[in-house]
Swiss-Prot record:
It comes from Staphylococcus saprophyticus subsp. saprophyticus (strain ATCC 15305 / DSM 20229 / NCIMB 8711 / NCTC 7292 / S-41). PANTHER family: ADENINE PHOSPHORIBOSYLTRANSFERASE. Its EC number is 2.4.2.7. The keyword Glycosyltransferase applies. This is Adenine phosphoribosyltransferase. It is found in: Cytoplasm. Keywords: Cytoplasm, Glycosyltransferase, Purine salvage, Transferase. HAMAP family: Aden_phosphoribosyltr. Transmembrane segments: none annotated. One of its GO terms (biological process) is adenine salvage. It holds the Pfam family Pribosyltran.
Length: 172
């Protein structure tokens, strides 16, 4: 299935000059969403994954159906102040400032094999932060799966030491 035909492109959103790739049009088509989920499930099975991790919010909508299909758990990565129990945190730089992501301190057990999922790889900052959190808890990142990779932003450079799969790639 050619998933690219299900991606909507929104010009000048969220700001002028940006051509936003919207995956909600994959999700609102049961066949396309199921296909994308199944592809990531197969990728995860080959890596003997114990748990799925996904950053908010779209990492949830990619990772949760994969975890459910595999009969394994899902651990969320969230912005600071959004998780109710004790957390670990990772602060990283943005173009104009910083951001903080957190995970529950008991979300990952040492040695667990982790697949990180998200909708889109752009600059790689969010996924790099998720990797740092997983590894701080002793998890082993055995794969990272995206629906879309924006190759022209070179986000792969931040995660080049990991096994990465993307279902759709945009060169420009």
């Amino acid at each position: 299935m050619d998933l690219k035909q299900y991606v909507s492109e929104v010009e000048d959103w969220p700001k002028p000059g940006v051509n936003f790739k919207d995956i909600t049009t994959i999700m609102d088509n049961g066949e396309a969403y199921g296909y994308a989920t199944d592809q990531i499930v197969e990728y995860a099975k080959l890596r003997d994954v114990d748990i799925i991790v996904g950053p908010e919010a779209r990492g949830f909508i990619i990772g949760c159906p994969v975890a459910y299909s595999m009969g394994i758990g899902f651990a969320p990565v969230r912005k600071e102040g959004k998780l109710p129990r004790e957390v670990i945190r990772y602060e990283y730089d943005l173009e104009y400032g910083t951001n903080v992501l957190t995970m529950h301190k008991d979300a990952i057990k040492p040695g667990q094999r982790v697949l990180i999922t998200d909708d889109l790889l752009a600059t790689g900052g969010t996924i790099e932060a998720a990797i740092k959190l997983v590894e701080k808890l002793g998890g082993i990142v055995v794969g990272i799966a995206f629906i879309i990779e924006l190759k022209y932003l070179n986000g792969i450079e931040k995660i080049k030491d990991y096994d990465v799969m993307s279902l759709i790639s945009y060169e420009d």
